[in-house]
A protein has these predicted regions:
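Conserved, mostly hydrophobic/aromatic
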Residues: 17, 95, 128
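Conserved small/polar residues in nucleotide/adenosyl-binding loops
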Residues: 134-143
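Hydrophobic faces of well-ordered beta-strands that scaffold small-molecule active sites
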Residues: 4-7, 25-27, 60-64, 91-93, ...
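N-terminal basic/disordered segments at the start of proteins
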Residues: 3-24
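Active-site-adjacent beta->alpha loops and helix N-cap segments on the catalytic face
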Residues: 37-47, 96-105
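Glycine-rich, proline-tolerant flexible connector loops at the mouths of alpha/beta enzymes
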Residues: 26-44, 64-70
């Protein structure tokens, strides 16, 4: 299934994407995103963004696309929990350890392979299927792996 996916760094961009036909929005929160110094939504704003997107029949994904250290995994749980409860549609993940962690603690949460994961062949794509990935997002990869 093809999906028009748009980035959003703030509520204004998110609303513009929804109002201009995006099927889904992706954004970073206050932690674990590759664009740590970019403008990102607060926890409260992100929960409101989830609600707004769902009211308009769209999906919303959050990036967890940094490499995590062992000590950060408990932080990841506390970080994702409010968004999971609010109905976040999925996470875009880079770190394979985070994949295992999210799969164990948030088993219903769809995971998308971040472009930083650099999956460029069918062996990599097949492996991701075995660890609960539902989407592969790599700029370099054609749709017909």
């Amino acid at each position: 299934m093809k999906e028009l996916l748009s980035p959003a760094g703030n509520m204004e961009c998110l609303k513009a994407a929804v109002n201009n036909g995006a099927d889904a929005i992706y954004l970073g929160g206050s932690a674990f995103g590759a664009r740590a110094y970019a403008q990102n939504l607060s926890e409260e704003d992100l929960v409101q963004a989830i609600e707004y997107v769902h009211i308009h029949g769209r999906k919303i994904y959050m990036t967890v696309n940094t490499l995590l250290k062992d000590r950060e995994l408990n932080e990841l749980y506390a970080y994702l929990l409010p968004y999971y409860k609010a109905g976040l549609d999925g996470v875009i993940v880079q770190d394979i350890g985070a994949v295992k962690f999210i799969g164990e603690y948030f088993p219903e949460m769809p995971m998308h392979a971040s472009t930083q994961m650099t999956i460029t062949n069918t062996l990599g794509a097949d492996f991701l299927k075995t660890v609960s990935y539902t989407h592969l997002r790599a700029h370099e990869t054609k749709a017909n792996l």
